[in-house]
């Protein structure tokens, strides 16, 4: 065997160096929110396509720091409440600023305006600054959990609540 068989030639070395940043970019992100693919990414809890940037939410947590996407803050609240690691301080909870539809806010620091026409009908829109018509995260979370899943998120045959309200929609 010749002594050159174990050496990398110049062309192979350059190709390897060029591929390294590309391969590094393929590594999954483990913190912070990620861009949504509007009109393509599905909501984890209801399966509907996320299309309204003013109400989207993301949760990152668990042992693998997996990112999960939602079309409404209410779906994210319900989903997280069912996770065994829900109280882990490392869990990240992001919500889109409803005023801009382009800026992610830390959901626990955001303020929520009630009465919004949100995709799953939980009725909360996140905003950056407090106002006389907003509530904090804990208040919004409590109201969403007490209300339960909206009828839009329940499997067929499990619709509950006022049938007149459903007929109007």
Place the predicted regions along the sequence by residue.
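Residues immediately within or flanking Cys/His clusters that coordinate Zn2+
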Residues: 40
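N-terminal secretory signal peptides
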Residues: 1-22
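Short cysteine-rich clusters marking metal-coordination/redox-active sites
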Residues: 43
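Cys/His-coordinated zinc-binding microdomains
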Residues: 47
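Mature extracytoplasmic domains of secretory-pathway proteins
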Residues: 68-113
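Short, non-ligating residues that shape and space the ligands of small metal-coordination modules
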Residues: 52-53
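Beta-strand-rich cores of mature extracytoplasmic or soluble domains
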Residues: 97-169
């Amino acid at each position: 065997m010749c002594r050159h068989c174990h050496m990398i030639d110049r062309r192979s070395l350059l190709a390897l160096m060029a591929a390294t940043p590309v391969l590094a970019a393929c590594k999954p992100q483990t913190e912070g929110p990620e861009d949504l693919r509007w009109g393509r990414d599905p909501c984890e809890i209801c399966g509907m396509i996320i299309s309204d940037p003013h109400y989207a939410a993301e949760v990152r947590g668990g042992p693998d720091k997996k990112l999960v996407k939602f079309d409404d803050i209410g779906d994210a609240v319900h989903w997280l409440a069912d996770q065994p690691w829900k109280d882990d301080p490392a869990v990240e909870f992001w919500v889109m600023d409803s005023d801009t539809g382009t800026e992610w806010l830390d959901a626990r620091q955001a303020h929520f305006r009630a009465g919004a026409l949100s995709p799953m009908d939980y009725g909360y829109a996140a905003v950056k600054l407090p106002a006389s018509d907003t509530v904090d995260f804990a208040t919004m979370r409590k109201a969403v959990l007490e209300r339960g899943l909206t009828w839009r998120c329940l499997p067929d045959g499990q619709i509950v609540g006022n049938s007149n309200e459903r007929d109007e929609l």
